[in-house]
């Protein structure tokens, strides 16, 4: 991922081109059902899992790089449709998103923002930058805002993060851990990456994994307090909140 590359110590035999997403999905199901007969080799050859809660593969489709997700054994059958709807809602709310689409059988796919043709875009997660655990709650959004200011020197990037935070709060995306926020380096300038992994979810004990002004179950007051903690203009914060609220109204159940 990002601009880093690596090669396995041992040579992996190429299993050939597999263009049928359904075949890959069936191999995922075999692994989840503990039938490993050949499944791991097929998935590794197609890019393997890129981490996260759901099985994923990295695919090249029409010379474009995509990440395609498959349901885990505990996901609802329409999880792909749900995440796709979230991605459309996020765009409507003014959040920078990569291109997304539903592949056959409702598998959710996202265009990789760390690739521009053959060019690799250097990408670093908040987890890596701040040495913050993504397995356990380790951050507050205030710390993310401060990191954005320190890295980019641009208060507008804080506004982008604040908008994403509001979306996460309003749409109950509580698995907002430290690896779900990244920064990209282009032309020697850092900026917040497009948003990803936006979907209805629970964090530890049902709370936000990244707290909002110290609260895992935030109120509006907590939301604006987080902005105040880093000197982000309250007027602008309220404008963003209202824009996201209106963008989600009637599409996704609001949670504040």
Residue spans for each PLM region:
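Phosphate/dinucleotide-binding and metal-coordinating scaffold of catalytic cores
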Residues: 1-256
